[in-house]
Amino acid sequence: MGASAATGMQMVAARPCISASQGMLTSRAAVSRIGRALSTTTGFATCPRICYSSPLGSSKRSGVAIRAMSSESGPQGLPIDLRGKRAFIAGVADDNGYGWAIAKALAAAGAEILVGTWVPALNIFETSLRRGKFDESRKLPDGSLMEIVKVYPLDAVYDSPEDVPEDVKGNKRYAGSSNWTVKEVAESVKNDFGSIDILVHSLANGPEVTKPLLETSRRGYLAALSASSYSFVSLLQHFLPIMNPGGASISLTYIASERAIPGYGGGMSSAKAALESDTKVLAFEAGRKGKIRVNTISAGPLGSRAAKAIGFIEKMIEYSYVNAPLQKELLADEVGNTAAFLVSPLASAITGSTVYVDNGLNTMGLAVDSPTISS
């Protein structure tokens, strides 16, 4: 994780200045009582010190200016603390995607990490972990290595063993693995750990992603929705019973859900639109049923191995760099840090939202690198 993660996972508390010029606060005792009440109800780790000041320097001033100051002792700001929390991250198969970055951010905040890896990629992933090939990218801000407590085989296209077709059961890429449908994985996690607090969906696949929508088959279109959007519904459906109240779930989406991105085809744009719509519905249902928050992160393009299947990911990254308000490289860690915030108590009132982490590209309605504009 980048250096920013070491200190960047903190939200600096604002310092409001409240005037009492109307005589609403007439004594320091009253102010102290209010200060104590605020520190109790907000749940801040450090009680703010209430400082009294008179900018005019006059003892005749009737009002009292109040400024909340952080204590000189103890941690500054609002640290993201996920100690004692357990996260299951579905869709981690290497060390260069958003799923991995989210796992690192949650681990850096203290969470216990479980991952679900696509069955055909399981052997390579576990072997790479065991041989230390990921050790450099496992490094956390404190110098330790992210620990993945357990890796589960997972294919989120199938809800239960009854859904798996015979040709998949006999496929050699699935040989030696068992209990990898969504229902079975949820049951395995329950048997192994009892419960989780955080569920992350980092899954997407469109077998015809390089085809224009007008050339996409029904089978390819539905496959994209099944793997990229319904898989989130299925995961939450099966994991919700073992999620602790107050927990959170997040997924990853893309701006193609609402804008035409030529080349991002095969029904993938539709799948992302469905994912964002489902996020709102699931936020209501999971919130009422299990007190679970549900959000999605609309991340900018990243040159991960999975994204290279699109065929023009490097051009998408360059386009983003040139046209986004923030002309800088988008780091996977920035998405990871956003995820850590969204699943933390600091985001306890945020649910059903699509949060953009793309250097602001989603705000643009005109490509500034267009020859028409540049000329």
From Swiss-Prot:
It holds the Pfam family adh_short_C2. The keyword Phosphoprotein does not apply. The keyword Lipid biosynthesis applies. NAD(+) binds at G91, Y98, D155, A156, S202, L203, L252, K272, L302, G303, S304, R305, A306. It comes from the Eukaryota. InterPro entries: Enoyl-ACP_Rdtase_NADH, NAD(P)-bd_dom_sf, SDR_fam. Its main location: plastid. It is an enzyme of class 1 (oxidoreductase). Residues 1-67 form a transit peptide. PANTHER family: ENOYL-[ACYL-CARRIER-PROTEIN] REDUCTASE, ENOYL-[ACYL-CARRIER-PROTEIN] REDUCTASE [NADH], CHLOROPLASTIC. NCBIfam families: PRK06300.1. Catalyzes the NAD-dependent reduction of a carbon-carbon double bond in an enoyl moiety that is covalently linked to an acyl carrier protein (ACP). Catalyzes the last reduction step in the de novo synthesis cycle of fatty acids. Involved in the elongation cycle of fatty acids which are used in lipid metabolism. Required for normal plant growth. Belongs to the short-chain dehydrogenases/reductases (SDR) family. FabI subfamily. Homotetramer. This is Enoyl-[acyl-carrier-protein] reductase [NADH] 1, chloroplastic.
